[in-house]
Amino acid sequence: KAIKDMARDAKTAFMPQCGLAPGFIGIVAHHLAKGFDSVQDVQMRVGALPAFPTNSLKYNLTWSVDGLINEYCHPCEAIHGGESISALPLEGLEHFSLDGVEYEAFNTSGGLGTLCETWAGQVRSLDYKTVRYPGHRDLMQFLLGDLGLAADQENLKAIMRKSMPTTMQDVVLVFVTVSGQKNGMLLQEVFA
């Protein structure tokens, strides 16, 4: 919202939310949704994971530490029951497997960009969750909640930069599930 206010009278173009999430994930969701007569539910799941995790968090730095901590510490926009809500980060835990590999997914902030505003009044549910290897979420809850590092994010960032290796050998998972009405039938389409 602050960016929209700054851009309102600007003389230059600024195109935010053009990454993986937000960005690509929203394009995929829109592409799937346009094939329906009416959309009911949109679920988006994205994970950028190390191909070869070697620590208890089962995570290596694959992008910005600042962005990582930000998405774990701030409220998450979503739509449930047709109403815009603020969901807690690290909540809404799900488990699934793909090609024999186990994963977990949980609420994180920012991945929807402006989709809650775009689809307000048009969908029953819309949410975004980050995908990680099992156990990651519980350890992050311990660090952020039990140890209080959510209130000391700069220290947590320093610890992660010092202790967690960066890798370019990553795996990106993208799942988008859209369900709704098409030709009088309730259907579901998935991008994976």
Enumerate the language-model features and the residues they cover.
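Rossmann-fold NAD(P)-binding glycine/threonine-rich loop
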Residues: 1-14
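Short, conserved acidic/polar surface loops in the N-terminal third of protein domains
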Residues: 2-4, 26-28, 54-56
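General beta-strand structural signal in soluble alpha/beta enzymes
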Residues: 14-16, 44
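Secondary-structure boundary motif
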Residues: 9, 34-35
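C-terminal catalytic/substrate-binding lobe primarily of soluble NAD(P)-dependent oxidoreductases
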Residues: 35-192
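Short alpha-helices
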Residues: 18-28, 33
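Short gly/pro/ser/thr-enriched loop/turn and capping motifs at secondary-structure boundaries
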Residues: 1, 21-24, 47-52
